[in-house]
Every structure is written in C-alpha cells, then in structure tokens.
Swiss-Prot record:
A CDP-1,2-diacyl-sn-glycerol binds at G60, R64, S70. It comes from Saccharomyces cerevisiae (strain ATCC 204508 / S288c). This is CDP-diacylglycerol--inositol 3-phosphatidyltransferase. One of its GO terms (molecular function) is CDP-diacylglycerol-inositol 3-phosphatidyltransferase activity. Mg(2+) 1 binds at D56, D59, D77. Residues 1-20, 67-75, 120-145, 192-220 are cytoplasmic. Optimum pH is 8. It is a multi-pass membrane protein. Changing Y66C: Strongly decreases enzyme activity. Belongs to the CDP-alcohol phosphatidyltransferase class-I family.
C-alpha cells in the first residue's frame, strides 16, 4: 500500500516552510539584528553576522539532503547575501569616507554581477546560476562547482569587510587588521569572479537577443 500511495501534493505553503527556507528566514533575522548593534557592540555584531553567513552553507546542505531545492530558496539565499554585505558596506562608507567610492563601486559590482548572472542563466534555460561548464569559464566553473572553494572565497570576502569593521574598535583593531590582510587574496579572487560573471552574463543575454532578432527577421 505504501509503495503505491500517491505522494502528497506540494503546495505553496509547503515550499514556504521547507527546512532550508526556514534557515533562510533565520539568516534574514540575524542579519537584520546585526545592523541594530553594529555601531556600538562589535562582539554582538560579529556573532549575529557570522551566524547569518555560516547558515548560508547549512541551508544548501539541507535542501539537497531533504530534496527541498526551490527557486524561492535560491533567490532568498542570494538576496540575503547581497543585503547583509550591503548593510555592512554602508556602515564602512560612513566610517571610512576616504574609501567610500571604492566601497560603492564594489557594492555595485557585487549586486549587478550576481543579478545579471542569475537572470542570464535562467534566460538560457538553466535550472541554477551555479551550473557553469568548464568550457564556459574555468574560473566560474571552479568557483561554483567546488563547494569548498565557494565557501572559502565567500568567507574571505566577508572577512575582509569584517576585518575593516573590527579595526574601528580599539579592543579588536589588531585582530581586525590581520583578518583583513589574510583574507585579501580571497577578496581579490571574489571581485575577479564578479567581473568574469558580469561579462559572461552580458554575452549570454546579447546572444539570446541576437537569436531572437534573427528569428523575427525570418518572418519578414
């Protein structure tokens, strides 16, 4: 009887409460709370912000383990990443006015490259923006297909900004300085990957537009 039973119909409410999506909601809450304590409580901020970042690895694992991969989860994951980093960078713009333009450019690159990369991947019929063949881009293939590489580079990217943040407080200035120095190579790799995926996304979209234009021309 159990082998022939009809699987329960999945509803929107089920998807909303998938285990990885619940983890995603916790990520949003901890990231938001970290903004409230960011100005005066570096220890509390570090714990909350780190929790939000570390849960990023857990939600993907749970999605695969329980077969609960969803578009909602993928989008929630990406916008939480971008929003939490943006919040920290906004604070750094205020505290490091001499580097404000640099932070603005890096934030723009981060948001633009990830949005265009996801949109272009979906437009090309791919189920995930992380599906990058080695022939398309060796760097992005390494970055997106190796979970250890993806986790390490993303961690270094966050640690670079976190190190700059910690340098603002006397009790953690030295630790913050070394955190920034050690994470810098990974940070450079991340920005390079952003540039590469931005270029790749633009080419994919342009190629799709060219194909559509040629198809329309055939009708005339």
């Amino acid at each position: 009887m159990s082998s022939n039973s009809t699987p329960e119909k999945v509803t929107a409410e089920h998807v909303l409460w998938y285990i990885p999506n619940k983890i995603g909601y916790v990520r949003v809450i901890t990231a938001a709370l970290s903004f409230f304590v960011m100005k005066n409580h570096p220890t509390a901020f570090t714990w909350l912000y780190s929790t939000s970042c570390l849960l990023d690895a857990l939600d993907g694992t749970m999605a695969r383990k329980y077969n609960q991969v969803s578009s909602l989860g993928a989008v929630l994951d990406m916008v939480t990443d971008r929003s939490s980093t943006a919040g920290l960078m906004c604070f750094l713009c205020v505290q490091y006015p001499q580097w404000c333009v640099f932070f603005q450019l890096m934030l723009g690159l981060d948001i633009t490259s990830h949005y265009m990369h996801m949109y272009a991947s979906l437009s090309a019929g791919k189920t995930s923006h992380k599906s990058v063949g080695e022939g398309e881009s060796r760097l992005l293939h390494l970055y997106y297909t190796r979970r250890d590489v993806l986790f390490t580079i993303c961690a270094f990217n966050e640690l670079f900004y976190a190190g700059l943040y910690l340098q603002l407080f006397s009790n953690s200035a030295t630790f913050g300085k070394w955190t920034t120095i050690i994470s810098f190579p990974g940070y450079v790799f991340k920005q390079t990957a952003n540039v590469v995926q931005l270029k790749r996304a633009a080419l994919i979209l342009a190629d799709n537009d060219a194909k559509n234009a040629n198809e329309k021309n055939k009708t005339y």
